[in-house]
UniProtKB/Swiss-Prot annotation:
PubMed:6313520 sequence has the D12 allotypic marker, 104-Thr, and the E14 marker, 185-Thr. PubMed:6193512 has the D11 and E15 markers and Ref.5 the E15 marker. CDD domains: IgC1_CH3_IgAGD_CH4_IgAEM (cd05768). This is Ig gamma chain C region. It comes from Oryctolagus cuniculus (Rabbit). Keywords: Immunoglobulin domain, Repeat. Pfam families: C1-set.
């Protein structure tokens, strides 16, 4: 066959495999023809601890051999020098013990830096005097390199200093989420004042500002209707009571159920849906055991909305006798 030059591969132990003070490094000389090859280490200056194994003829007819050397694990990298006279080839390969370092995740590429979101108070909080409405400003994708975030709050463009201390949360993707909460008065929200959160962070070229206020427009009073379960449902273990709420504006509304003055929790509310006339409607479905409905328990749908008298109304429903 034609003479063929060898390929040379460095051999080094994996990181963590060698707690001992000596480490074995090697070179694999593969796929050459004809014999022989010579292997020296550090141009022949390193002879101590060298073992060069006999060549092996592979099924392809080409030859391979390996040479190893034992060195102290702290020593400099070593070089194997491979010569193949038949093809006039000389190859030098440097082999180094791999150093162990604790693997670290690369920091996520936070392109564009942090983002800011502002959230309105919960409708129930703005409508009940006993509760405190809050506007919330959330900053996400804050990097660990620039973790400091400053919040400045404004009501109708006048700075206020009544925000709670910011809360910081380390996220799983090694970014930080920072939340600032501003307690506000019921009146400031209901009268449509504008709340602004201004966020400073080193990773931002300029501060980010987000504003929020109640939807503008004439408030419209919700109409509330309750409906019992369809007859076909009475054979199931539980039945659905429906509270339909129609014609309200703005869309901020709170809907809950109770039975005998105690809260019922097993309900779901659809989001408020924009109707063709510009008002909103929604449905709320309460699931109750059929037995409670059949024995005549009274269920009450309670609605809170700013256009209602005292911000509150309720509608009750129970099984009428004979059904």
């Amino acid at each position: 066959g034609q003479p063929k030059a060898p390929s040379v591969f460095p051999l080094a132990p994996c990181c963590g495999d060698t707690p001992s003070s000596t480490v074995t490094l090697g070179c694999l000389v593969k796929g050459y023809l004809p014999e022989p090859v010579t292997v020296t280490w550090n141009s022949g200056t390193l002879t101590n601890g060298v073992r060069t194994f006999p060549s092996v003829r592979q099924s392809s007819g080409l030859y391979s051999l390996s040479s190893v050397v034992s060195v102290t694990s702290s020593s400099q990298p070593v070089t194997c020098n491979v010569a193949h006279p038949a093809t006039n080839t000389k190859v030098d390969k440097t082999v180094a013990p791999s150093t162990c370092s604790k693997p670290t995740c690369p920091p996520p590429e936070l392109l564009g830096g942090p983002s800011v979101f502002i959230f309105p108070p919960k409708p129930k909080d703005t409508l009940m005097i006993s509760r405190t409405p809050e506007v919330t400003c959330v900053v996400v994708d804050v990097s660990q390199d620039d973790p400091e975030v400053q919040f400045t709050w404004y009501i109708n463009n006048e700075q206020v200093r009544t925000a709670r201390p910011p809360l910081r949360e380390q996220q799983f993707n090694s970014t930080i989420r920072v939340v600032s909460t501003l307690p506000i008065t019921h009146q400031d929200w209901l009268r449509g004042k504008e709340f602004k959160c201004k966020v400073h962070n080193k990773a931002l070229p300029a501060p980010i500002e987000k504003t929020i206020s109640k939807a503008r427009g004439q408030p419209l009073e919700p109409k509330v209707y309750t409906m019992g379960p369809p007859r076909e449902e009475l054979s199931s273990r539980s039945v659905s009571l429906t509270c339909m709420i129609n014609g309200f504006y703005p869309s901020d509304i709170s809907v809950e159920w109770e039975k005998n003055g105690k809260a019922e929790d097993n309900y779901k509310t659809t989001p408020a849906v924009l109707d063709s006339d510009g008002s909103y409607f929604l449905y709320n479905k309460l699931s109750v055991p059929t037995s409670e409905w059949q024995r005549g328990d009274v269920f009450t749908c309670s609605v809170m909305h700013e256009a209602l008298h005292n911000h509150y109304t309720q509608k009750s429903i129970s099984r009428s006798p004979g059904k």
